């Protein structure tokens, strides 16, 4: 029986603890595989975040790329959106970002980008994995090695971003970059856009001394309090690589991811791409101004569907947004500026958020051994709808999403990183949400055993 090779790529590139899953050896092999895949020809742009292991990994990565014949353009310590932008702007064969995004300091990772700034698709990642497992690297002779150059793309990126936004009136904005890769760039762009900026955690530091890189409410108490105490119009927080952003309204409250996505969808209109776990409020807020199309969870799937549908905007309910008029790479800095643009034109964010309907939601997980996930999900697809008498639609593009006649819904998906089956649901009322949760969890506990 042929041995099954382990998957190296997860839902967002290769990611894990440095020295354990993410090692110098794996990084070098990964880069050799990329350069081999590219035929030992072309330019690869490389950036990294503020983590203590990032420059070390960059050195291993560059060595592997050059050894197999590709040229390297070093961007330095930059946020992920700048890597995607540089890949498309410079006509590179690929882009590489060394980052673990929102994960804690001991973690690091590698994510790949296409020439149009879109993340590598799963099919492309499997090709890289196959080359790594086979060790069929196409090394070059001493006189065919790639070259290494360093380019500063920050000014170019700043100019390009500012051309796409217009802050109609000056705003006071508090920016918490979390000591990540946007620590200098995000405040700089906001100032150039005409905002008065107060910064928190704006010193690049891979130990993340100010807060955890994950921009969730429990990590943003200082930002929320600063917005309140300074009378700011808006608060912005980024994760470690700034492919995401979150917003704090003018009352110092965390802005719901789904509601913020809904507001931006309404503002832009047309075809809007989001994921199967996004709230019904996105559909209701957009109304007849456009169409919501749902796809699999993950920014690469959102990007692919944007390209296929010719959509004007797409995003996940995690603060990961894509703006195809600029670049197909998720961009937390541009997203934050467009929220500021919305506030400057439409009024206080707290009032705008009140215009978006709220529905009770529940997120839960049920223990399930990894080896049982496939068979359990087959049963879920065939049987879960029987738990409800008013099913209107079943979507199996990513897990199983069941919509009920009143718009309530439940999504069941296997975790890609933990031994759990995850439940996400939304009910039109608290009672309906509890009912859906009880029926779904009870069913899963019964079939998992």
UniProtKB/Swiss-Prot annotation:
GO biological process, one term: carbohydrate metabolic process
Entry keyword set: Isomerase, Magnesium, Metal-binding, Phosphoprotein
Pfam families named in the record: PGM_PMM_I, PGM_PMM_II, PGM_PMM_III, PGM_PMM_IV
Cross-referenced InterPro entries: A-D-PHexomutase_a/b/a-I, A-D-PHexomutase_a/b/a-I/II/III, A-D-PHexomutase_a/b/a-II, A-D-PHexomutase_a/b/a-III, A-D-PHexomutase_C, A-D-PHexomutase_C_sf, A-D-PHexomutase_CS, Alpha-D-phosphohexomutase_SF
Enzyme Commission (EC) number: 5.4.2.10
UniProt catalytic activity: alpha-D-glucosamine 1-phosphate = D-glucosamine 6-phosphate
Similarity field: Belongs to the phosphohexose mutase family.
Function noted in UniProt: Catalyzes the conversion of glucosamine-6-phosphate to glucosamine-1-phosphate.
Name by which UniProt lists this protein: Probable phosphoglucosamine mutase
Species this chain originates from: Methanothermobacter thermautotrophicus (strain ATCC 29096 / DSM 1053 / JCM 10044 / NBRC 100330 / Delta H)
Gene giving rise to this polypeptide: glmM
